Structure formats: C-alpha cells, structure tokens
From Swiss-Prot:
It comes from the Bacteria. Its EC number is 1.1.1.130. Belongs to the LDH2/MDH2 oxidoreductase family. DlgD subfamily. The keyword Disulfide bond does not apply. This is 2,3-diketo-L-gulonate reductase. Homodimer. GO terms for molecular function: 3-dehydro-L-gulonate 2-dehydrogenase activity; NAD+ binding. The gene is dlgD. GO terms for cellular component: cytoplasm.
Length: 332
C-alpha cells in the first residue's frame, strides 16, 4: 500500500504520544522515523517502529532522558546517553562531532548507554550534507555467530562512511551480509536473498531469509573478514565510550539497550580547497562508473547514490508500506 509522509508521521506521532512521550519529543522522533522510511530504508523506519514501541513499553528506552557529557579532551568527547531515544540522541551526537570538527578539523564523540539508532546512515548523511566526512558505528546485542561458530557471540555492528561528493557517496553496512531488517523486508516481499545470507539448520549456505531469521545463523560480510571487523569495531566503541561491549549487553541486559556508539566528523575543507576536492571526487566517480559492464543492462552503482532517486520517487508516488506492518502500527 501507499501512504504519504504526513500520514506516516501522524501515525508514529499518535502512538508515541499515547505512550506518554511529550509532544515535542514525539514530533521529533516521528519525523526521523518518517524521513528514514521516505528515504527508502523501510527496514529501519516503518518496519522497525513496532519493535521500538515494544522497547519503550518495556522501559529499555527512557523517553525523557537526555545525553550527558562525561569527558572532554579537545577533539574527543565521551557522553552517556542515559538510555534516551536512540535516533534523536544519535543526531545530537553527530551534530556535536561536527561542532568539534569545525574547531579542530576532526571531532569524535564516543557514546555509552545508548539505544538502537535506527538508520545509521542518517548520521553519516547528516555530516556529508554539511560538507564533512561522516563516520559512525555502533555495537549491538550478539546476533551473529563469529566465523567458525554456530552460536551468536558477536554483533552485526553497522559501520557508516559518508563522503560529501555530489551526490553524497555513502556506505551503510552491517558486518553481516544482510541486516536482520533486510531479511524481514525480503521475507515480507516473498523474495529469496540475491546472494547467500546465512546457514540453514544443516549448516548449508542459504538464500532463505525466514530460515536465517529463525536460527540466527546469519553470515558475516566477507566471511571471516566481517567477523573480524565486528569484533574490532566492538572493542573500539567499548574502550572509547567506557561503555558496554556486545558480551556485556548480551549477558547482562534483558534486551538490546545500553549499547556503545562512535560518531566522527572530519572537515575536509581544512585540508583541501573546494574546487580541487570536487574535481578529485568526480574523477574517482567517473573512473568507477565508466568501467566496462559485466551486464549491459545493469549500471555500475556508487554506494548511496540510489537514495536521491528513491527519495524523489517516494515523494512523487507515495511511500510503499507493507500491509501487515501498517496494520501493526494502526493497532498500536
């Protein structure tokens, strides 16, 4: 089905206010969920909203909490999210990293005691729109087996890198082949995954999203490489924030909350003039996209460039929402 941005935001806002969230916070949170969905990231927008409300009702998320600065070391700051609303706090933390970068050339904010930030790409994009390189990542509860194991002991720990090119170039990727959100999107659409995304119960690689959702044997991106990246990203976020690791979140908490996150902004214009920056970026993009195609009907893509098109299409034609997901939200 199709809905407008206004319908989507109003539905989110209604549910948040009915759960006791104050009107200003509810409006800002609803706006972010709706913008994420409008951008085409349904897995971490509309599809994730019922799960967000579940955690709000369980007390994992404290809606009136505000992040608090703990330590300041020039370009580096350490903050405690105090289990505040994840997407609103993440936006504030990237804003703070940008402020630090404006003074120092680079800014790094390490955040502990945080909640799920929904679409991580929003915060990299936020920096790139202002002309900064944006880098951020988060740890999570253990939802992926390390390479060679059957039991979940590491997080998908998504990493975002956004570059202020025209259009913005951005990688937004979990350390698994697919996020659990994208497994859900494909299952709801009745689709197999385009490539293997995990193991079935017999230990064979599979493209069936429902099987992987059930047995949790999701495949690390690049096999052992994604497994290793997940571990070191967790270590860095834990150390810099003095926060909880994947092990601590999984073993000590009843659900995924109290996680650790990193936000980095780099002011490129302190290092290179604007025309030179633009020319270098354009040469890179042109060199990549003019490579001989393996399939004449399939264009060579640059990461993140599709979001500009998706956003325009959703604004023109309405936002596609799965019927069952919309029914869940209406019932909240």
């Amino acid at each position: 089905m199709k809905v407008t941005f206004e319908q989507l935001k109003a539905a989110f806002n209604r549910v948040l206010i009915s759960r006791g969230v104050d009107s200003e916070t509810a409006n800002a949170c609803a706006e972010m969920f709706a913008r994420t969905t409008e951008s085409g990231v349904y897995s971490h927008g509309v599809n994730r909203f019922p799960r967000f409300i579940q955690q709000l009702e369980n007390g994992d998320i404290i809606p009136d909490a505000q992040p608090k600065r703990i330590t300041s070391l020039g370009a580096i700051e350490q903050w405690d999210a105090q289990r505040s609303i994840g997407n609103l706090t993440a936006k504030k933390m990237m804003d703070r990293a940008i402020e630090l970068a404006a003074d120092h050339g680079i800014g790094l904010v390490a955040l502990r005691n945080a909640n799920h930030w929904m679409r991580g790409g929003s915060y990299g994009w936020q920096a790139a729109e202002k002309g900064y390189i944006g880098i951020c990542w988060t740890n999570s509860i253990a939802v992926m087996p390390p390479w060679g194991a059957k039991e979940c002991r590491i997080g998908t720990n998504p990493l975002i890198v956004a570059i202020p090119s025209t259009p913005i170039t951005m990688v937004d990727m979990s350390m698994s082949m697919f996020s659990y959100g994208m497994l859900e999107v494909n299952r709801l659409a009745g689709r197999q995954l385009p490539v293997d995304g995990g193991f079935d119960d017999e230990g064979n690689l599979t493209k069936e999203p429902g099987v992987i959702e059930k047995n949790r044997r999701i495949l690390p991106m690049g096999y052992w490489k994604g497994s290793g990246m997940s571990i070191v990203l967790d270590m860095i976020a834990t150390l810099l924030s003095d926060g909880a690791s994947v092990a601590e979140v999984t073993q000590d908490n009843s659900d995924e909350y109290g996680i650790s996150q990193i936000f980095i902004a780099i002011e490129v214009d302190k290092l290179i003039d604007g025309p030179t920056r633009d020319a270098k970026l354009q040469r890179i993009m042109d060199y990549v996209t003019t490579a001989e195609r393996a399939d004449e009907n399939q264009a060579i893509r640059l990461p993140g460039h599709e979001f500009t098109t998706l956003l325009a299409e959703n604004r023109r034609n309405g936002i596609t929402v799965d019927d069952s997901v919309w029914a869940k939200i209406q019932a909240l």
